[in-house]
C-alpha cells in the first residue's frame, strides 16, 4: 500500500484527474517503499494545460510589475515557512539525506525566486534617439506560454530555477517533473496558487518524457522549452522544439567536469573540495568534478587525504539527521552506476575504496552504492569519458600545466571546471583556458541566484539564473515614432 494518496495533475489552479486513467509508481530508494501512484498525463491533458496557461498568462501579464513581484515574494515566504515539510517529502522521493534537503534544495530554490521577484520591476526597454523628430523605443514583452522539463536529482530546486524567471517576466509555465521524483513540483504548484499566482500560470503534468515531454516540445502554442537532463535526450528535445515551431530552448545537460589540483595547492583544502565535488548528494550532481587531476609529485599524499575524508562519510538512513550520504535515486540508476564501476575494474583502474553495492542489514533494501575512488586512471577509460552520475571519483596523474589543461578539455562536455592553487596568476590563466561554462577557483559547487550557470560544447545551450536568464524569457519589440512629416518617395 502506498504511503500517500494517488497524485493528480495540477491544471488551472487545482488538482484534476488525468484523462488517460494510467498511473505510475514513485519509489523511496532508501527502502523500496511505494510512496504514491501518480497519474500519467495524456495528450488531451497537455492540451488542457496549454489552454489553461494561455488564459492565465493573459491575466498575469496584465498585472503591474509590482503586483507580480509581491505575489512571487509571497510564494518565497510560503516556501520558507514550509521548508522542513517540503524537505521531508524531497528526502522520501529522492533518497537525499534530510540534513541536505533542509539546508539546500528548498532554500536555494527560494533564493532564486526571491532574486527574480526583486527584478520584476527592473524589466524595461530602451529609448534610442534618431533625429529631432524621431526616436525608437523598445519593449520587453513576455514570450507567452513556456515549458520546463525537470531532472530527478533536484526536483523542487529545478522547478523553481525554471519557473522563477519565466513567471517574473510575465509568462505562464507548464512544468513536467521527472517521473522518478515528481512529488515536490506538485506542492510548488499549490504554493504558487496560494500566493496569488493566477490559475493556469503554473501547471504541472506528470508522466514520461517520451510522451508528455515530446507533446510539450511539439506544441505550437509553447514558445520556449527549458530542459535539464542528459545530453542524448537534450538533443532530441532541441530537435523537436526547433523543428515544430522554432521554439527557443535552454538546455542544461551532462558533464564530465575536471578538477585540476596544482602542485602548490593546499592538499587538505584540495581533498576537501574533491570529496565534496564527487560525493555530495551521493554524486548525483551535474557539475560534479569527477575527473580529478593531481600532479605526479603529490599523488600519494593526495590519495591518503581523500581516503581519510571518505572514511568520515556517514552513509545511512536519509531520515537520520546524522546521515550525510544516502542511496542513489532509484534501483535502475544504481544498476547503471554499478555497471560503470565494473567497467573501471575491468579496464584496470586501481580501486582505492568502495566499488560495490552496500547490502549490510537494512541497506540491502535500498539503492546504496559505497563512495568509490579509482586512481591511476587513463583518459580512454569509460569511467573517465562518460557521465556516471554517481559516487565515483577518477584520479588522473599529470606532469605539467599544459598537459593538465589539454587533457581536461579533451571531452565532448563543457559544463564545469575548477582549479586549486595558491598562485593567483596561474588560477586565472588556467581558468581562461578551460572550456567550461561554470568555473571555480579554490572552491566547488556553489551556484548562487546571481550566477549564470550553463555549459559549453555538448553540456548545454543558454543559461539559468542571473540577469541574462530573465532577458531570455522576454522578446524585444522595437517601435519607431515619427513626430514630424512623413516623406513618401511616390
From Swiss-Prot:
<dbReference type="InterPro" id="IPR016162">
    <property type="entry name" value="Ald_DH_N"/>
</dbReference>
<feature type="binding site">
    <location>
        <position position="26"/>
    </location>
    <ligand>
        <name>K(+) 1</name>
    </ligand>
</feature>
<dbReference type="GO" id="GO:0019285">
    <property type="term" value="P:glycine betaine biosynthetic process from choline"/>
</dbReference>
<comment type="subunit">
    <text>Dimer of dimers.</text>
</comment>
<feature type="active site" description="Nucleophile">
    <location>
        <position position="286"/>
    </location>
</feature>
<feature type="modified residue" description="Cysteine sulfenic acid (-SOH)">
    <location>
        <position position="286"/>
    </location>
</feature>
<feature type="binding site">
    <location>
        <position position="457"/>
    </location>
    <ligand>
        <name>K(+) 2</name>
    </ligand>
</feature>
<dbReference type="GO" id="GO:0046872">
    <property type="term" value="F:metal ion binding"/>
</dbReference>
<dbReference type="InterPro" id="IPR016160">
    <property type="entry name" value="Ald_DH_CS_CYS"/>
</dbReference>
<keyword id="KW-0521">NADP</keyword>
<dbReference type="InterPro" id="IPR029510">
    <property type="entry name" value="Ald_DH_CS_GLU"/>
</dbReference>
<feature type="binding site">
    <location>
        <position position="246"/>
    </location>
    <ligand>
        <name>K(+) 2</name>
    </ligand>
</feature>
<feature type="binding site">
    <location>
        <position position="254"/>
    </location>
    <ligand>
        <name>NAD(+)</name>
    </ligand>
</feature>
<keyword id="KW-0479">Metal-binding</keyword>
<protein>
    <recommendedName>
        <fullName>Betaine aldehyde dehydrogenase</fullName>
        <ecNumber>1.2.1.8</ecNumber>
    </recommendedName>
</protein>
<comment type="function">
    <text>Involved in the biosynthesis of the osmoprotectant glycine betaine. Catalyzes the irreversible oxidation of betaine aldehyde to the corresponding acid.</text>
</comment>
<dbReference type="InterPro" id="IPR016163">
    <property type="entry name" value="Ald_DH_C"/>
</dbReference>
<feature type="binding site">
    <location>
        <position position="460"/>
    </location>
    <ligand>
        <name>K(+) 2</name>
    </ligand>
</feature>
<feature type="binding site" description="covalent">
    <location>
        <position position="286"/>
    </location>
    <ligand>
        <name>NAD(+)</name>
    </ligand>
</feature>
<feature type="site" description="Seems to be a necessary countercharge to the potassium cations">
    <location>
        <position position="248"/>
    </location>
</feature>
<keyword id="KW-0520">NAD</keyword>
<dbReference type="Pfam" id="PF00171">
    <property type="entry name" value="Aldedh"/>
</dbReference>
<feature type="binding site">
    <location>
        <position position="387"/>
    </location>
    <ligand>
        <name>NAD(+)</name>
    </ligand>
</feature>
<comment type="similarity">
    <text>Belongs to the aldehyde dehydrogenase family.</text>
</comment>
<keyword id="KW-0560">Oxidoreductase</keyword>
<dbReference type="InterPro" id="IPR011264">
    <property type="entry name" value="BADH"/>
</dbReference>
<feature type="active site" description="Charge relay system">
    <location>
        <position position="464"/>
    </location>
</feature>
<feature type="binding site">
    <location>
        <begin position="230"/>
        <end position="233"/>
    </location>
    <ligand>
        <name>NAD(+)</name>
    </ligand>
</feature>
<feature type="active site" description="Proton acceptor">
    <location>
        <position position="252"/>
    </location>
</feature>
<dbReference type="InterPro" id="IPR015590">
    <property type="entry name" value="Aldehyde_DH_dom"/>
</dbReference>
<comment type="pathway">
    <text>Amine and polyamine biosynthesis; betaine biosynthesis via choline pathway; betaine from betaine aldehyde: step 1/1.</text>
</comment>
<feature type="binding site">
    <location>
        <position position="180"/>
    </location>
    <ligand>
        <name>K(+) 1</name>
    </ligand>
</feature>
<dbReference type="GO" id="GO:0008802">
    <property type="term" value="F:betaine-aldehyde dehydrogenase (NAD+) activity"/>
</dbReference>
<feature type="binding site">
    <location>
        <begin position="150"/>
        <end position="152"/>
    </location>
    <ligand>
        <name>NAD(+)</name>
    </ligand>
</feature>
<feature type="binding site">
    <location>
        <position position="93"/>
    </location>
    <ligand>
        <name>K(+) 1</name>
    </ligand>
</feature>
<dbReference type="InterPro" id="IPR016161">
    <property type="entry name" value="Ald_DH/histidinol_DH"/>
</dbReference>
<feature type="binding site">
    <location>
        <position position="27"/>
    </location>
    <ligand>
        <name>K(+) 1</name>
    </ligand>
</feature>
<keyword id="KW-0558">Oxidation</keyword>
<feature type="binding site">
    <location>
        <begin position="176"/>
        <end position="179"/>
    </location>
    <ligand>
        <name>NAD(+)</name>
    </ligand>
</feature>
<feature type="active site" description="Charge relay system">
    <location>
        <position position="162"/>
    </location>
</feature>
<keyword id="KW-0630">Potassium</keyword>
